[in-house]
Amino acid sequence: MAKEKFERTKPHLNIGTIGHIDHGKTTLTAAITKALAYKGFADFTPFDAIDKAPEEKARGITINVTHVEYETEKRHYAHIDCPGHADYIKNMITGAAQMDGAILVVAATDGVMPQTREHVLLARQVNVPAMVVFINKVDMVDDEELVELVEEEVRDLLSKYEFPGDEVPVIKGSALMALEADNPDDPWVQKIYELMDAVDNYVPEPQRETDKPFLMPIEDIFSITGRGTVVTGRIERGVIHVGDEVEIVGLSYEVRKTVVTGVEMFRKLLDEGVAGDNVGCLLRGVGKDEVKRGQVLAKPGSITPHKKFKANIYVLKKEEGGRHTPFTKGYRPQFYIRTADVTGELVDLPEGVEMVMPGDNVVMTVELIYPVAIEKGMRFAVREGGRTVGAGVVSEIIE
């Protein structure tokens, strides 16, 4: 009957478990739901239920992700767990399940492993704001010093990727022992509560979409006789009021200023439009042919047009509907960035990488044929001949 107590008044956060295969991410997810179920804050979700992750589609890519939800005294969480390493990469690059924070799981028996590094690097590239560490399987290590060494190693890794390695909370426990325990006072279960306290207090509450600077990708343009030009789209973030000054950004380096003289939704006039709304904005003094799909309407000074950037791109496998063959420098696909569809060229690959194979994820430098409104952490799709061949996230803007 725990369901009755669920309240929606608490702040909501999206969290995920990351780390190397078999280090205990899924076991920990199950243990968290079991520990919080004792307090009436969750429904216990067993390991098998989490491990059978349903398929989801994001930007044309199939990803296996499990979502569980639970609460603490302070917050409501949606927790994501992916069964396979490739699913993590695809999820983080497509942003299918956005993370406000992550729990990095590292087995005391192994320490930092290749996928541990890769997940931390990805978390940095896609701007996961904060991380809490759970050193798992400490029941299987006799030597306390070994656990200390693993902690040092993890802190160094986090610092290397620009997370505050010295400040990050590190909790040591055993997900399996906590899962097998049968009372909330068990010391292993207490470690799970300690972990959730760290998540509650260390992972910052995300800025609400409505508090961010206004941005709306332009999908369509209409001309209304006697009134002017209306652009439509879904507001990505922020709020727009009638009378606000905005910029039209993208498709050239010239940024045009105008004023929104009307906002309408479902043919009704509004005083304001907020993040998530599909609206039409009437623009003062802008001709129908002076604005195009692929540009964005944005708060002045909040976003700029760019042509060249670095991105982490996941290249779809043949089985996922992607390419059958590798590609090299000079490859020219289409980049779908918000509503813009622009040809771009792969101008640089990492040192030692000659070609990119289907199934790889690689940091590459892209140069578009014309500038688009771009920012770090932004997602996009790579398409060729009408099919998605990759998904990417902008990791650095060059020019």
Swiss-Prot record:
Superkingdom of origin organism: Bacteria
Region G2: start-end pairs: 60-64
Record-linked InterPro entries: EF-Tu_GTP-bd, EF-Tu_GTPase, EFTu-like_2, EFTU_2, G_TR_CS, P-loop_NTPase, Small_GTP-bd, T_Tr_GTP-bd_dom
Residues reported in the UniProt entry to bind Mg(2+): 26
Region feature (G3): 81-84
Group of enzyme by EC: hydrolase
CDD domains registered for this protein in UniProt: EF_Tu, EFTU_II, EFTU_III
GO molecular function: GTP binding; GTPase activity; translation elongation factor activity
GO terms under cellular component: cytosol
PROSITE patterns: G_TR_1 (PS00301), G_TR_2 (PS51722)
Region (G5): 174-176
Domain tr-type G as annotated: residue spans: 10-207
EC annotation from Swiss-Prot or TrEMBL: 3.6.5.3
Catalytic activity: GTP + H2O = GDP + phosphate + H(+)
Subunit structure: Monomer.
Function (record text): GTP hydrolase that promotes the GTP-dependent binding of aminoacyl-tRNA to the A-site of ribosomes during protein biosynthesis.
Protein name: Elongation factor Tu
